[in-house]
Amino acid sequence: MTTEFLVLSRQDLREAMHFADYVEAIAEGFQLLAEGRCESPIPTEIPAACGTFHVKTGSLPRGAGFVAAKINGNFPGNRNRYGLPTIQGAVFLADASNGQPLALLDSMEITLQRTGAVTAVAARYLARSDLGDSDDM
């Protein structure tokens, strides 16, 4: 069975997902990780002439569902030299049961939203209960 391969830009992701979607995905991911139902191997660094590539991978749940790999390049001189962002990258998503590529996603929107979502999840579970309702997160 062949599935359509999706390519989603940063703008596509902005339109398709809301911050609350990221918060719930992060909360679920942390729960699966705590239960040992997903893999999150140690990230890899690949040196380059003027920067570094960072490779982060994971599977959900435990290889039976999806495998993702995020590759971000961090090139501090990009803005001055080329007018490009310091950090650029992509997320590759595949079916873990048969290896079929499913999507290639711009990583910047995901990375930015994930950072905020992790903070929201931490606040949800670590904030003092007498500070008020955290359901807004």
PLM regions and their residue ranges:
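N-terminal ligand-binding/catalytic initiation module
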Residues: 1-114, 118-120
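Glycine-rich adenosine-cofactor-binding loop
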Residues: 95, 116-137
